[in-house]
Amino acid sequence: MAELERIDSRDRTDGMPRMKRLRQIPPEVGKFIALLAAAAPAGRWIEIGTSAGYSTLWLALACRAVGRKITTYEILADKAALARQTFAAAGVSDVVELVHGDALDHLPGDKDIAFCFLDAEKEAYGRVYEAVVPGMVPGGILIADNAINHQATLQPMLDRALKDERLDALIVPIGKGELVCRKK
């Protein structure tokens, strides 16, 4: 984790273009999502938007603690390759399945989702939300990153989630803002 934190810090200060940066969550958000994931009910764990795998490492720690596995989706080939290296180096490949491709190709009809962490291209959040929520188990948790710093782009999805009668939802001001939803 320390190496990815170092690279992320460097990329943010040296002007690396946004699409080439690792774009990972800060450590306190990693701890937060791992804590919530470990408390999720029985069912599948998924992550949408792997990047280099930093958030997945936090979730892998939770997987190990409670005997689960996670499937993570990354659409960009170079980031999927980097994530595979990250998982191998960290020794978590046994609890992480990386799928290179668009999560939206896999999510329709997906059932038994107990935990979902969403940190992908912001324009896709609404479609991902609509694909994930119907497949969530009661008590299932959906966390969407960047709910505060990308609020303008995410506002339609945020409004939908905060008013969705199937869920209890709120925005937690940690990191760049986390939308946390729990299925009723």
Residue ranges and their predicted role:
Residues M1-F115, K122-I143, A147-K184:
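A short alpha-helical cap/connector motif
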